[in-house]
Amino acid sequence: MKTLILTLLSLYELQLCCGAYNQNIRSQRKFEMIKTEISSYKDVAKSIIDLAVHGKAQNRSYERLALFVDTVGNRMSGSENLKTAIAYMYKSLQEDDLDRVYLEPVKVPHWERGEESAMLLEPRKKSLAILGLGGSIGTPVEGISAEVIVVSSFAELHNRSKEAKGKIVVYNEPFVNYGETVRYRGSGAVEAAKVGAVASLIRSVTPLSVYSPHTGWQWYENDVPKIPTASITVEDAEMLSRMASRGLKIVIQLKMGAVNHPDADSYNTVAEIVGSKYPEQVVIVSGHLDSWDVGQGAMDDGGGAFISWEALSLIKDLGLRPKRTLRLVLWTGEEQGGVGASQYYELHKKNISNIDLVMESDIGTFMPLGMQFTGKPEARAIMTEVMQLLQPINITSLYDYAEGTDINSWMQAGVPGASLFDDISKYFWFHHSQGDTMTVQDPVWMNLCAAVWTVVSYVVADMEEMLPR
């Protein structure tokens, strides 16, 4: 009996092994078929690349963007400029003869900075360049004049908490990388308020400064007093730190006319090329249309928005129609935490099984180096093959972890996601500053970015099967 049981167990294990082996063989065969399918797009990919980089569409995304930002300017959430920008894009997309163009209403924060200034009163008089941080409250009309404490970290602030009461906290945090250093912009006011400070000034989150403050959104916490907060230049933060190290008394007068208005009406702007075979299934290409209220918002995120529009234009110009719908979404309210995209997700998540791939470009359109991808290993293997279609421009690398505030909800829910990976070595020089203008952009780089964006989105949208998830 014991021998029989062992024999049956052995046969069962053998069956399992054979089943796994056969499954692996089937998977390998299927993947080889997918590779063959992807390889069949070489001519189409070359046509897209030729049109975008060398043909009639050369420099088009750059020229469209230049006209847009020169005409509209920056596009702060809730502002009249953003309304103008959305109307401009709605009209332009209609004129591009795409299949569907429509607006989806959302609510967005409406904050205005108003007049603002900072004056060093002691140990000498000097005007300090500032940019109020998004969501900040204002000061009284007469401003706030207070002694300053300079710290280089949250840990130092907490260790010196008794010194901070009634003072303005100046953070002179070193730039490590954006993800690490931006914590001071986001939470600096809250941490300062917890120890009794009356305002906070944050060293701009940038590795390079030419006396230019960089703004950005910050967040208050319930049950913590709200205090005014602004960014200052790297140069002034370092000067104040040197003064403090010499034991000098530092006094600053801060005036901010910032106002938080009720949420405003806005729209996500959407355009589509409807799929020929599976129109209910969708590949999304996207960038955000809003920007900060300084500079032109050409880099952040005009470039990403306009290469996403260019993807649909190139496909239309070549007379192509993918099997799935290719959907352009120009998000609103991204700079306030992706509020437009969050509302889009809530509205459309019931159709999540039909969202094949979400793509977002929001970290510049400099020289493209490849794509970042988040998804199952099987999907990654397919995307690796798709990237090989870009060999004519030598941009074939696929990196881990797609990035994008506006597509995070989809990726967290299991939808494959992709983002443009480009040379961002200079990105944070201009980020959220007056320097974010059309001068940052390069038409050759934008052509290449558009080619990458279009080839990937079209091929994924046209393949017979959706990406595994």
Swiss-Prot record:
Entry binding sites for Zn(2+) 2: D300, E335, H432
Signal peptide: 1-19
Enzyme class, UniProt record, top EC level: hydrolase
Record EC number: 3.4.17.-
Annotated catalytic residues: E334 (nucleophile)
CDD domains (UniProt xref): M28_Pgcp_like
Record Pfam families: Peptidase_M28
Prosequence residues removed at maturation: 20-42
Cellular compartments annotated: Endoplasmic reticulum; Golgi apparatus; Lysosome; Secreted
GO molecular function, one term: metallodipeptidase activity
Protein keywords: Carboxypeptidase, Endoplasmic reticulum, Glycoprotein, Golgi apparatus, Hydrolase, Lysosome, Metal-binding, Metalloprotease, Protease, Secreted, Signal, Zinc, Zymogen
GO cellular component: cytoplasm; endoplasmic reticulum; extracellular space; Golgi apparatus; lysosome
Major site of localization recorded for this protein: endoplasmic reticulum
Biological process, per Gene Ontology: peptide catabolic process; proteolysis
Glycan-carrying positions: N59, N159, N351, N394
Subunit and interaction comment: Homodimer. The monomeric form is inactive while the homodimer is active.
Family of this protein: Belongs to the peptidase M28 family.
Described function: Carboxypeptidase that may play an important role in the hydrolysis of circulating peptides. Catalyzes more efficiently the hydrolysis of dipeptides with unsubstituted terminals into amino acids.
Protein's name according to its UniProt entry: Carboxypeptidase Q
Organism: Xenopus laevis
Gene name linked to the record: cpq
